[in-house]
Amino acid sequence: MKKGKIKALLVLLVIVLAGIYYYVTIPAINIHSTGIWIFILFVLVLILAAYAAKKKFTSIREVKSSKFLKIGGIVLMAVLLVFAAGSILSSPIVNAKQYRNLLTIEERDFSEDIQPVNFSQIPLLDKDSAMILGNRKMGSMVDMVSQFEVSDLYSQINYQEKPVRVTPLVYASPIKWLTNQSQGIPAYIMIDMTTQDTSLVKLDKPIRYSEAEYLNRNIYRHLRFHYPTYIFDQLSFEIDDNGTPYWVCPVRKYTIGLFGGATIGRVVLCNAQTGECQDYTLKDCPEWVDRANPADLLIQQYNYYGTLVHGYINSIFGQKGCLKSTDGYNYMAMEDDVWVYTGVTSVSGDQSNVGFVLINQR
């Protein structure tokens, strides 16, 4: 085979493999995304491997004498060094004060600030209990149970001033996806957290964009192709005041170095039925959205606040004055929003609560 054809085939192979890697991993094209750095390293290794295959080196001496491989190796090491330096300089080790200030905390008096809650607004079920009810409801739907299952999402939201959990159906298997994906997902589950009433809400238009899809209608891939530079946090399945299903997609903003100080700067709302996307700042987000800030991120930010009170070294060794959230958290419906609440304890692990924290997910 002619050298020109071999070169063209190798170039095509590199492009195809890089394209497949990008399509599968869908990293954000953003300097703050660790995924894009890994993608760059992958492409560099592919290029060097293709060049070595074209040249058909027969000895280590030939490899060492190749100017192209030397330059490629230097570029590869430079990318690795920048990535490593960025990771260290973005960490709490050198930015303890900035990490502690990620979340604004107000100390309040419980008896003065917290009013008695209407019992009709107190969730009586946790997520595990809701999952049991959801699976039981799905099992009774003889026309769907062989083709669909219930997703494990179970997002807690406020719907018409009631705390409910909502979760979409998913295809029962890849084969069931293949036979049903043209029609989409026909319903979602809604559970009233105060009365335990469980309903399967059938939709006039099916859900076509979800985590259960495998190709372009996969919600993560759909978002990436619409917003190639956005770094998305944990997605949440919610419904608006009319019961229309949406994906609430928080967009991360990094405020400390390359990879540190993650907060939420924007929210993308994706209609799960049509795939239509709308981009909002946090303050302009529609009122029905309850989970603009993921609970795990808020808890992490509180733990930075509690443990870094006297710097990073103290948080590891002396631990003077260090507090952290207790294991697990739950949700409370208050002021027509969903609040994350968790206990606060010392890092010594004495299992005693010294208070609790309420964080608005808006």
Language model regions located:
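Soluble extracytoplasmic regions of secretory-pathway and membrane proteins
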Residues: 3-362
